[in-house]
Design a protein with these regions (language model features):
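Acetyl-CoA-dependent GNAT
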Residues: 3, 7-81, 86-87, 99-101, ...
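Nucleotide phosphate-binding site architecture
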Residues: 6, 71, 90, 123, ...
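Active-site acidic-Proline motif in GNAT/NAT acetyltransferases
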Residues: 86-92, 120-121
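Short glycine-rich hinge loops at helix-strand junctions in the catalytic core
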Residues: 93, 110, 133
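Conserved GNAT acetyl-CoA-binding A-motif
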Residues: 106-118
Length: 135
């Protein structure tokens, strides 16, 4: 199985939104909908145009199996957003590949720090971030 990490492409917009909502609602039972996440409606404006980036992990069938976003806060700080990996694709190092892409991009752009926020329900995410050097 090959997983490719690609830059966001508008043709994936609806699949991206459904992918993230499905994980939030079905897996973590978070009461959230599309209107609560306006950043997903316009990735170009909310991520790309401000110096950030958004990547997708794509499987052999060209379906999204992971996401990660990077918002540029100022010249040397950024924030990690919307990191999700499909439950059936976890433990395949996809999250690590996505996070490595963010870290490499930050180094290339001389970004000194990456903020991230998570919630108590994302226990495995907290463990993952801690194991990858986040405090």
């Amino acid at each position: 199985m090959t997983i490719n990490i690609i830059e966001y492409n508008r043709s994936y917009k609806e699949e991206l939104i459904e992918f993230i909502l499905s994980i939030q609602k079905n897996e973590f039972n978070i009461k959230i909908d599309r209107d609560d996440q306006p950043d997903l409606e316009n990735i170009e404006h909310n991520y790309l145009n401000s110096g950030g980036q958004f990547w997708l992990a794509i499987n052999n069938h060209q379906n999204i199996v992971g996401t990660i976003g990077l918002i540029r806060l100022d010249n040397n700080m950024s924030a990690l957003k919307k990191m999700f990996v499909d439950e059936g694709y976890r433990n395949l190092k996809i999250g690590k590949k996505l996070l490595d892409k963010v870290i490499m991009t930050c180094k290339e752009q001389n970004i000194d720090g990456i903020y991230l926020g998570t919630i108590d329900k994302f226990i495995s995410a907290q463990y993952f971030y801690s194991n990858n050097g986040f405090r």
